[in-house]
Amino acid sequence: MAHSSPASPPSHVGRPEPPDPRRWRALALLGVAQLMLILDVTVVNVALPDIGADLGLGRATLTWVVTAYTLFFGGLMLLGGRLADVLGARRLMLAGLGIFVLASLASGLANGAAMLVGGRVGQGLGAALLSPAALATVTTTFHGAERTKALGVWAALGGAGSAIGVLLGGALTAGPGWRWIFFINVPVGLAVLVTLPLVVRAGAAHPGTRRVDLPGALLVTAATASLIYGLVNAGDAGWGDTVTLTAVAAAAVLYAVFGVVERAVRTPLMRVRLLTRRPVLSGAFLMLVATGMLIGLFFLGSFYLQRHQGYSALLTGLLFLPVAVGTGLGAHLGSHLVDRLGGRLPAAIGLTLAAAGTGLVALLAVTPTLMVTGLTVASIGLGAVFVSGTTTALAPAAPEESGLASGVVNTFHELGGAVGVAVVSSLAAPSLTGPVLTGFTTAFTSWAVVGVVAALVALALLPPGRLPAFDGPRVH
């Protein structure tokens, strides 16, 4: 999965400090930490059938095992970026890493649904504190051409994380067992925790920015949790069920209240007015759809290959490798197209490819060969969409707003994964809980329709032509 950066810190006026001689070691260490966070999005998918069998968990609970992490990672990411400014980036990284390690240990020791989902929530909280602070550190540690190179390495961790995640998940589940997909974070996290103060400077906190929009963070997280609850419930009770409709309606109300709160507070978590700008709105839309589709496909594929075909977790992980590589290939090709054509056409082409890949599986037959082929085609398209979304949103942004725009886009990135898994879990419910394939066909057909509709929306919504770079002050 292509994974873009959560936020960028504001630029500071004044003469830059001399290069830190430890900067490349710091990048390597922070890269390991960020890779660990990205791994935990995809590493779980391959292990879900084993987790369900061992702990006696049903479809709905297994869906929450995936979504709880991305929900809190995305819902609290902007708050994490704000706290990094208030408390200092290194302090927040250490706190976030400590929480993540403890939550990983709890997840690995889980003996039931409550402890496992609670551990995943804790992992999401730790990731939301660690990731934006780590990126802020990378951005302030490097300057000029070195900064561009460092941020390129950071962005590349996304695709690598997806590929390593599915392989590692399969290998650990087939070897020492599914609990080790969580336990592996403990020694790695502790090593980073001990080493980090030795290679990363203690950045200054900003005492003049003590206000933190905690209500905003809680509102957007609660709204998305309510939406996911409604979507997951639909798989058992139906889309017209009272509980389903009530949960979705409550989510809509909470999102509206969030918008009101963000306009009223002095230091908002998200400047809602950014979403009135066509580039930022376009980027947020693309990241929401692309991440939802990709993580949903990992979820569907894992259950199909293991439960319906009887494949081992290791073989499933290996079969997902072309899908993960396809995402990276699509991102590489997409970056060249975006440079030449702008974001609109590559996004539309990418979404059309995603629709074609999922439609291939839905229309012909759900077989292992077609499954992997279709998902690989879809992943190439979605890789291009990730690049289009990020570049469209950030290229025209003024320097002082690039961090805000990046934070908005990447919040939609993480929340898209949570919503996508919830949707396909309900659509494919008959196949996830029984021997029939009709649920998989329904889910893949729906994803193909989503791809087509999203491609049409992209053509209408994204600015035409090559993307303009910011070249002067913006007047409001």
Where are these regions (language model features)?
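Intrinsic disorder in cytosolic terminal tails and internal cytosolic loops
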Residues: 1-22, 206-209, 461-476
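Membrane-interface helix caps and helix-loop-helix hairpins in membrane proteins
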Residues: 113, 177, 203-209, 234-240, ...
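12-transmembrane solute porter fold
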Residues: 24-48, 59, 65-69, 134, ...
